[in-house]
Structure formats: C-alpha cells, structure tokens
Amino acid sequence: MIRIKDNFKNYKKHKKILKLSKGFIGSNSKIFKISNQKIMKALYFSFSDRKKKKRSNKKIWINRINYFLKNYFFNNFNYNKIINKIKLNKICINKKILSEIIINDYKTIYKLKNMLT
C-alpha cells in the first residue's frame, strides 16, 4: 500500500487557521496546533465580550443620566424617578438616546423637563 503524505483537506484547513491567526505573536501564528488553540480562545472571548460591551454601555448611559439629573437638572430627582415619569407620560425614549441628548442638545432636555413637570 502506498503511503499518502499530502491530504488536500487538511492542507486547506491548516491554511485557513493560519490565515486567521495572522498578526499573532511568535509561534501563535506559525504553528498550526498552537494557532488553532489561540483562534478558538479568541473567538470564544470575542463572543462573550460583545455581550459585556452591551452591559457596560448600558451602565455608562445610566450613570450619565443620573449624574446630569442630580447635578444640573432636577434638585431631588434621580434616574429611577425620571424613567418612571417618562413611562407614565408615554414618552418613547430609551436610555441611549436620552444620554446622547444630555450630551449634545440642551434645548430638548428643557422641553422634556417641561413635559414631565
């Protein structure tokens, strides 16, 4: 029986993994076995970090809103009370948009204040 050295499918698989690991340092981008492990770990972390990014952005929006309300806008209001008033008045605005309005557009904030009070 003839021994077959080259397997086309494995060659393609190895090339694909080594192409994905381009830019990794040292043997992490040169050796298939190591680069395969690094790619698997990188893909795992990229998935979980996309979820973490959403969580951290939501925290940032809430902190911005709360800081603005306590220091500049309302005297004794905090985030919970304002969100509750917005929902009771049936104003369709989410946390992200509200934080962007706070940063960029003061006229809209004062209109919102007049609607809530």
UniProtKB/Swiss-Prot annotation:
Q: Name one GO cellular component term.
A: plastid
Where is this protein localized, as stated in its record?
Answer: Plastid
One molecular function GO term is: rRNA binding
Looking at the keywords, is Plastid present? yes
Q: Which domain of life is it from?
A: Eukaryota
- Indicate the principal place this protein occupies in or around the cell: plastid
Keyword annotations from UniProtKB, A to Z: Plastid, Ribonucleoprotein, Ribosomal protein, RNA-binding, rRNA-binding
Q: Which GO terms describe its biological process?
A: translation
Q: Which family does it belong to?
A: Belongs to the bacterial ribosomal protein bL20 family.
Q: Which HAMAP family match?
A: Ribosomal_bL20 (MF_00382)
* Free-text function comment from the UniProt entry: Binds directly to 23S ribosomal RNA and is necessary for the in vitro assembly process of the 50S ribosomal subunit. It is not involved in the protein synthesizing functions of that subunit.
- PANTHER family documented for this protein: 39S RIBOSOMAL PROTEIN L20
From the Swiss-Prot or TrEMBL record, give the protein name: Large ribosomal subunit protein bL20c
Which species? Euglena longa
